Amino acid sequence: MKYFTLALTLLFLLLINPCKDMNFAWAESSEKVERASPQQAKYCYEQCNVNKVPFDQCYQMCSPLERS
């Protein structure tokens, strides 16, 4: 019973106070990711939509990044 209560408490805390990085679990460290193809960029924007990420953050993450 203790473990069940603990698990429910942890789940509740995760639901009400999600970690910022968890929203971008499908990306690398909440930073811009180099997108090699339009399909990858489309997938990135779709994931932003699913995770309800604001457009400006999504644009920063999904737009291609020139690496120097």
From Swiss-Prot:
<dbReference type="GO" id="GO:0005576">
    <property type="term" value="C:extracellular region"/>
</dbReference>
<keyword id="KW-0800">Toxin</keyword>
<dbReference type="GO" id="GO:0090729">
    <property type="term" value="F:toxin activity"/>
</dbReference>
<feature type="signal peptide">
    <location>
        <begin position="1"/>
        <end position="21"/>
    </location>
</feature>
<protein>
    <recommendedName>
        <fullName>Wasabi receptor toxin</fullName>
    </recommendedName>
</protein>
<feature type="propeptide">
    <location>
        <begin position="22"/>
        <end position="35"/>
    </location>
</feature>
<keyword id="KW-0732">Signal</keyword>
<keyword id="KW-0964">Secreted</keyword>
<keyword id="KW-1015">Disulfide bond</keyword>
<dbReference type="GO" id="GO:0030430">
    <property type="term" value="C:host cell cytoplasm"/>
</dbReference>
<comment type="similarity">
    <text>Belongs to the short scorpion toxin superfamily. Potassium channel inhibitor kappa-KTx family. Kappa-KTx 1 subfamily.</text>
</comment>
<keyword id="KW-1035">Host cytoplasm</keyword>
<feature type="disulfide bond">
    <location>
        <begin position="48"/>
        <end position="58"/>
    </location>
</feature>
<dbReference type="GO" id="GO:0099106">
    <property type="term" value="F:ion channel regulator activity"/>
</dbReference>
<keyword id="KW-0872">Ion channel impairing toxin</keyword>
<comment type="function">
    <text>Cell-penetrating peptide (CPP) with defensive purpose that induces pain by specifically activating mammalian sensory neuron TRPA1 channels. It non-covalently binds to the same region than other TRPA1 agonists (irritants), but acts via a distinct biochemical mechanism. Its binding stabilizes the TRPA1 open state and diminishes calcium-permeability. Consequently, it produces pain and pain hypersensitivity, but fails to trigger efferent release of neuropeptides (CGRP) and neurogenic inflammation typically produced by noxious electrophiles.</text>
</comment>
<keyword id="KW-0582">Pharmaceutical</keyword>
<comment type="subunit">
    <text>Monomer.</text>
</comment>
<feature type="disulfide bond">
    <location>
        <begin position="44"/>
        <end position="62"/>
    </location>
</feature>
